[in-house]
C-alpha cells in the first residue's frame, strides 16, 4: 500500500544489494534462476559470433581482392539476402526443411552436435551477411591506400600485403560493427531459444513474461543489459589498442 516512489526506492535499494526478488514460479531467488540460464545463451552466442566474424573476414577479404569479380558479385547478393532475412522466418523454414521434410536434424531441445546446428546457423546468418559487406568495403579501401601501393612497389609478397597491411588496417571499422552484431545476436537468442526450446536466458524471459514472473523478467533484462554494456566497453578498449590514433587522443 506504499506510494509508488517508496516502492521504487525500496526496489532500487534491494537491487543495489543484489536482491532481485524471488521467482513466483520456482520459489527461489530470481538472480539464481537467471544465472543458471546465462551459460547456455553465452555459449550459443559466442560460437555464433565467432563463426560469423571469421566467415566474414574470409569471404569479405576474398571479395575485396578482386572487386566486381564473379566471387564478389555472388557474395554481395548472398550477403545482402542473408542480412535481410528475419530470424523467425529462417528458423521456421529451416525446421520445415531439415527436421520435418528431410529428418536430418532434431526439431528442438539441447544435446549433442546435431542440436547446435540449426540454432547457431540461424544466429549466424544475419551478422555474417552484414559483416561481409563491412569487411569487403574496408578491405577495398585498405588495399587501394598509399601504404599498400608502396608495399607492392617495394616487392613485398602479395600474401604479406593482404594480411599484414591490408587486413590489419581494414578490420578496424569491423570491430565497432562486430560489437553491435554481438548485441544483435544476444537479442536474436530470445527468438532462437524460444523456437528451438533452448533453456537459455531468452526462453526464460519469454516464459517468465507469459507466466507473469516479473522478478525473473526484471533480473533477465538487467543482466542482459549489463552483458551488452560490457561487450561495448570491451570493443572500445580493443579499438583503442589496435588503433594508435585513438590512444594518442
Give the location of each predicted region.
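Hydrophobic alpha-helical transmembrane segments of membrane transport/permease proteins
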Residues: 1-9, 102-118
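An internal, D/E-rich "acidic patch" concept
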Residues: 1-57
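Short, hydrophobic secondary-structure boundary micro-motifs
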Residues: 5-9, 21-24, 90-91, 106-108, ...
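Membrane-water interface segments at the C-terminal ends of transmembrane alpha-helices
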Residues: 10-13, 77-107, 122-126, 133
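A short secondary-structure junction motif
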Residues: 15-19, 101, 185
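Alpha-helical transmembrane segments and their lipid-water interface positions
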Residues: 17, 90-91, 140
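Alpha-helical transmembrane segments of integral membrane proteins
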Residues: 34-71, 100, 110-249
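Active-site-proximal inter-transmembrane loops
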Residues: 72, 76
Amino acid at each position: 500500500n506504499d506510494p509508488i516512489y517508496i516502492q521504487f526506492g525500496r526496489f532500487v535499494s534491494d537491487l543495489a544489494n543484489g536482491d532481485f526478488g524471488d521467482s513466483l514460479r520456482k520459489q527461489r531467488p530470481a538472480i539464481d534462476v537467471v544465472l543458471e540460464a546465462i551459460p547456455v545463451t553465452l555459449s550459443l552466442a559466442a560460437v555464433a559470433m565467432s563463426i560469423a566474424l571469421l566467415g566474414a573476414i574470409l569471404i569479405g577479404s576474398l571479395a575485396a581482392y578482386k572487386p566486381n569479380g564473379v566471387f564478389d558479385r555472388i557474395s554481395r547478393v548472398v550477403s545482402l539476402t542473408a542480412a535481410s532475412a528475419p530470424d523467425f522466418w529462417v528458423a521456421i523454414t529451416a525446421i520445415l526443411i531439415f527436421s520435418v521434410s528431410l529428418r536430418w536434424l532434431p526439431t528442438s531441445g539441447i544435446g549433442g552436435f546435431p542440436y547446435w546446428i540449426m540454432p547457431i546457423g540461424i544466429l549466424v546468418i544475419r551478422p555474417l551477411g552484414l559483416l561481409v559487406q563491412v569487411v569487403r568495403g574496408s578491405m577495398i579501401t585498405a588495399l587501394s591506400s598509399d601504404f599498400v601501393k608502396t608495399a607492392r612497389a617495394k616487392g613485398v609478397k602479395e600474401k604479406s600485403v593482404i594480411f599484414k597491411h591490408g587486413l590489419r588496417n581494414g578490420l578496424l571499422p569491423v570491430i565497432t560493427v562486430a560489437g553491435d552484431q554481438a548485441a544483435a545476436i544476444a537479442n536474436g537468442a530470445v527468438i532462437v531459444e524460444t523456437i528451438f526450446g533452448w533453456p537459455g536466458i531468452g526462453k526464460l524471459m519469454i516464459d517468465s513474461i507469459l507466466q507473469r514472473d516479473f522478478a525473473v523478467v526484471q533480473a533477465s533484462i538487467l543482466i542482459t543489459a549489463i552483458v551488452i554494456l560490457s561487450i561495448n566497453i570491451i570493443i572500445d578498449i580493443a579499438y583503442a589498442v589496435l588503433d594508435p590514433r585513438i590512444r594518442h587522443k
